[in-house]
Structure formats: structure tokens, C-alpha cells
Swiss-Prot record:
It is an enzyme of class 2 (transferase). PROSITE patterns: HEXAPEP_TRANSFERASES. One of its GO terms (molecular function) is GTP binding. Its main location: cytoplasm. Its EC number is 2.7.7.13. GO terms for biological process: division septum assembly; GDP-mannose biosynthetic process; protein glycosylation. This is Mannose-1-phosphate guanyltransferase. The keyword GTP-binding applies. Belongs to the transferase hexapeptide repeat family. It is found in: Cytoplasm. Involved in cell wall synthesis where it is required for glycosylation. Involved in cell cycle progression through cell-size checkpoint. Required for the correct assembly of the septum. Pathway: Nucleotide-sugar biosynthesis; GDP-alpha-D-mannose biosynthesis; GDP-alpha-D-mannose from alpha-D-mannose 1-phosphate (GTP route): step 1/1. It comes from Schizosaccharomyces pombe (strain 972 / ATCC 24843) (Fission yeast).
């Protein structure tokens, strides 16, 4: 089987982290975001993966080629000279996607979930139409475009309704699809939206079904959703791979993922919902909650971090405090006793004064 991952462009929503690495290479749960998808695709029997990229492709190539042998997959890079939207990349990769006339998966690189690829493929084969999209249920459908089915069908899509004022459905597009190669005949190699142009045409022809996703789902393309997604991911690990999580103790509260190479000081309180990356050093008396500490960072004694992301190689000084979706880029230093409230700090900066106004960007 084959798959195309829509990697996309600049990752501006996840800055300042994406000023250092393309978004798919930013770690989520201590592995690059895109590796979660590659692993799941390989486990479902996918052997050919196309990455549609238009930003820093050389870094993507270097980083991901090493996974080909590990997961026994062929990874091909389809490089866009201009952004082609969510449908144009399919036309650009037509030779690969259509080569054996079998269906192929398409997915957005920002989506983290319990990927249902094997069940999705079986469901798609059973109904026989051109396409199937994964849908997930949400509590506030008025914020999204929703999927509406025909009254006599649980899966055949009748229409899409953008941000409905009155309730018509609570299912939204989950950013994961399986399509027959015939769908490629509907797409031209130009900037095109699969959601706004291709799918409505398929709906008109009664060729698009939906598949309900079980379990969690999150688009982790911006910091607050990255943190929420981390909570959901750790809960999923607790159900399916509890041995990966740190064992509960007087210092560990709830779901916590710690790389074996990290060093943890005395009298810390860590958790719930914390990820600590490789070669991280945590000092004595540190409090961490609902946060991610990325590779090779240092959190000095008695620092306090909540609902924040600490980028690679950064240092939090003693008695410093970071909260309210603060994000540190690569190699940031927050000096001792400094308070950062919802700040976004670009790489290689040193912070010596409090940041008290949420949304402040330090350039």
C-alpha cells in the first residue's frame, strides 16, 4: 500500500520551534511528529510513503531517509516549487500513487491520534466508493466544518456545512483519508483544496464515505493544541503501553514520559502530563506540570514549569517560573528568578526581565 503525508510549509503556528526545525521534525512525545505516522503506516502494511514538502526539504530528506531501513518502507519526497494546497500535491505525486491501481492513504502531518489505517482500509474496500475520510466527534461543532450523512446511511456523505449555527452534526474532518487512484483524475497540478474543491465534487457523485475514529484526535500544529495533544497521547500510552511511562512514586504524578538519558534531581514533583526529552537535566526541587522539555535542556533547582514548551538546549534558571503556554525556542536562557507568562521566545535569546503580558514575543 501507499500513503502521502501533507507536510506543507513554514509551520508558522508552532513558532518559535519551527524556526529551528520543520514542524514534522519537532518532537512530540519524544519522537518527531511525522515518525508517529510513519510507524503507524508501516504497521498497517504501507510500503511506499510520499512526503509532500515545500519548506526546507533538504532537512527532511536527511532526517527521514534513515527510517527507511528501520521500518522497511520507501520514502519519496515530492518537492513543490510553490505551495499546492491540500490537493495539488496528489497530482504532483500521481506516478507513485497510481502505479498499481490500489487505494492510497492521505494524511495531514499535524494530526496525532490512534491511527486506524488497517480498519480504514477494510471499511473503504467494503463500501466500494472512491473515497473515505476519517471523522471525529467534537463537543462544539459550531467552530468547525461538519460532515452530514444521508438520512438512510451511517457513512455516505450528503454535504458539508461550515460552522453551523444550528446543530446538524458533530462529526468533523479528521485529516486522514483513503482514496482510489481514480480520484487523481479530479485534480490538476495547481494550488487546489481537497476539502473545498475535490471532496464536494465527490459528494455530488455519491462517492465519499466517512469512517468514525475511535479514541483521541488532535491537530497539534500550535502550542496550546500541542500541549492538549500531549495529554491525550500520554493517556493513550497509559492504556496501550503503560510500561513506557515513568512508574508512579512520591515524585511522579500521573502520566509522565521520561527519556532514559534524562537526569532528575531530588525532591522534584513531576506530572501529570509531562514529557522530558533526551539528555535533559532537571535540578532539585523542580515542579513540572503539563509541559514538554525538549532535548538537552536544563531546568535549574526549584524552577516551576506549567503548560509550556521548553525548546532544545535551553536553560531555565533557579526559581524561575514558566506558565500559560509559554514557548522557548532553541538555546534560550531564562535567568534566575525570572517569570514568563505566556511568552514566545525566539532562539538564542537571554531573558533577564519578567514577561508578564501573555502573547509577548521576544525577538
Amino acid at each position: 500500500m501507499k500513503a502521502l503525508i501533507l507536510v506543507g510549509g513554514f509551520g508558522t503556528r508552532l513558532r518559535p520551534l519551527t524556526l529551528t526545525l520543520p514542524k514534522p521534525l519537532v518532537e512530540f512525545g519524544n519522537k518527531p511528529m511525522i515518525l508517529h505516522q510513519v510507524e503507524a503506516l508501516a504497521a498497517a502494511g504501507v510500503t511506499d510513503i510520499v512526503l509532500a514538502v515545500n519548506y526546507r526539504p533538504e532537512i527532511m530528506v536527511e532526517a527521514l531517509k534513515k527510517y527507511e531501513k528501520e521500518y522497511n518502507v520507501n520514502i519519496t519526497f515530492s518537492v513543490e516549487n510553490e505551495p499546492l494546497g491540500t490537493a495539488g500535491p496528489l497530482a504532483l505525486a500521481r506516478d507513485i500513487l497510481a502505479k498499481d491501481h490500489s487505494p492510497f492513504f492521505v494524511l495531514n502531518s499535524d494530526v496525532i491520534c490512534e491511527y486506524p489505517f488497517a480498519d480504514l482500509a477494510a471499511f473503504h474496500k467494503a463500501h466500494g466508493a472512491e473515497g473515505t475520510i476519517v471523522v471525529t466527534k467534537v463537543e462544539e461543532p459550531s467552530k468547525y466544518g461538519v460532515v452530514v450523512h444521508y438520512p438512510n446511511s451511517e457513512s455516505l456523505i450528503e454535504r458539508f456545512v461550515e460552522k453551523p449555527v444550528e446543530f446538524v452534526s458533530n462529526r468533523i474532518n479528521g485529516g486522514i483519508y483513503i482514496l482510489n487512484p481514480s480520484v487523481l483524475d479530479r485534480i490538476e497540478p495547481r494550488p487546489t483544496s481537497i476539502e473545498k474543491e475535490v471532496f464536494p465534487a465527490m459528494v455530488n457523485d455519491k462517492q465519499l464515505h466517512s469512517f468514525d475514529l475511535e479514541g483521541y484526535w488532535m491537530d497539534v500544529g500550535q502550542p496550546k493544541d500541542y500541549l492538549t495533544g500531549t495529554c491525550l497521547y500520554l493517556s493513550s500510552l497509559r492504556k496501550h503501553k503503560p510500561e513506557i511511562l515513568a512508574p508512579a512514586s512520591s515524585n511522579i504524578i500521573g502520566n509522565v514520559l521520561i527519556d532514559p538519558s534524562a537526569t532528575i534531581g531530588k525532591n522534584c514533583k513531576i506530572g501529570p502530563n509531562v514529557v522530558i526529552g533526551p539528555n535533559v537535566t532537571i535540578g532539585d526541587g523542580v515542579r513540572l506540570q503539563r509541559c514538554a522539555i525538549l532535548k538537552s535542556s536544563r531546568v535549574r533547582d526549584h524552577a516551576w514549569v506549567k503548560s509550556s514548551i521548553v525548546g532544545w538546549n535551553s536553560t531555565l534558571g533557579s526559581w524561575s517560573r514558566l506558565e500559560n503556554v509559554s514557548v522557548l525556542g532553541d538555546d534560550v536562557v531564562v535567568n534566575d528568578e525570572i517569570y514568563v507568562n505566556g511568552g514566545s521566545i525566539l532562539p538564542h535569546k537571554s531573558i533577564s526581565a519578567n514577561i508578564e503580558v501573555p502573547g509577548t514575543i521576544v525577538m
